[in-house]
Amino acid sequence: MPWLAPLMAVSGIALAAGSGASGVAASEPATRQPSPAWTDGRFAWKSSGPIVDVGPDRSAPDPHIAIKDPTVVFADGRWHVFATVRMKSGRVDIEYLNFVSWAEANQAPRHVLALHSQYYCAPQVFFFSPHRRWYLIYQLADSSRQPPFGPCFSTTRRLADPKSWTPPQPMVTNAPAKPKWLDFWVIADTEKAHLFYTSLDGHLWRRETRLADFPLGWSSQQLALRADLFEASHTYRLQGLNRYLTIVEAQGKARRYYKAYLADRLEGPWRPLADSIEHSFAAPANVQLDVPWTDNFSHGELIRAGIDERMEINPGRIRFLYQGASDEEYRSTGYGGIPWRLGMLESQR
C-alpha cells in the first residue's frame, strides 16, 4: 500500500533482516544488558506503523478484512509468519508468508493453509527439537469431534512449504464435553511440555505432559493464574535470567492491552509485573506512535531468541509483533468486522 512505506520510515523501528535463527537483526549485537523493566515493570515502547495488512486479498472473491493472531520465527535467513485471516463471509483460516526484511513483509506472497473446512485459527509455530519437526498449534472447531472445539496440531519438516503441513490432529483427549478454553500455547522445560490457555473469565489454565509423550498425554487442567485478564496468553523463558514471563491480553477503557507476570517455574506461582492499564506491559499510555493508527494492542507475540520449544526471548532486546486497530475501527463494528493489521513494538528501555 502506498501509505505503508512512510509510516514505517517515520516509526524509528529497525525493520531489518535477521542474521540467523536467533532472530537478531544484522545491525544489533547478539546480547545486551537485560531491560530494567524486568525488575521495575516500567515498560516503554515505540511502535512501527502497520507493517502487514490484508494486502491483495482485500480483492479476493471472499475479501479478507483482517489479519491477526500472529506467530513468528526467524529460520534459514527469513522471517516466517503465520496469522489468522478473517474473510467478509465470516470464515477464518491461517495464512503464511515469509520474507527477508520486515520492510518487505507486506509485499510477500500469501498462502492460505486451508487445513480444515471449519473454524480454525490463532496459530503458534515452533521447532520441537526431540522430533526434529516443526509444529503448528491452533484452535479448531470440528462438529464431528468430542469436544468439538479445542487445541490441534499439524507438523512438517519443511517450514517454508505451506502445502507440507499434516492434517489437524487433536491434542487433548481427556477434556470435558464443553470445556471453556481458547488461545492455546505450548512451552517446554527440560522435562515437560506445558499447555497454557485462557477461558475468557479471568482464569489462566495449565496442563502438562512428559516431553516423551508430546503432543499427547496431557494431565488434567490446573489453575495457573486468576486475575483481571481475558485471552491470548503467551509464555516465554527470559534467556539468562532463569525466569519465565507470561503476557496476557486484558480489556480496559473499551480497549485491548497487555499485562505481564513472572514466575521462577512454569508451574508457578505467577506474580504481577505490569498488571493494570495504568502500569501495563503494552497499552496506549506507554507506547509512542509517531503516526497514530492504533489504540489497541491485542493478540501478539514476542520476537524469540530461537526457534524451539523453550520459547526463549532476549531480555535485552524486547520486540512485540501485535495486532492493532484504532478506537473507531474497534468500536464501530462487531468483533468479526474489525480490520486488524500487524505492527511491531520495540522496547525503549
Regions found by a protein language model. Name each.
Residues P2-A17:
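Bacterial N-terminal signal peptides
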Residues N296:
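Conserved glycosyltransferase catalytic-site signature
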Residues H299:
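Active-site pocket scaffolds in enzymes
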Residues G23-A232, R237-W293, G306-R349:
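Beta-rich carbohydrate-recognition and catalytic domains
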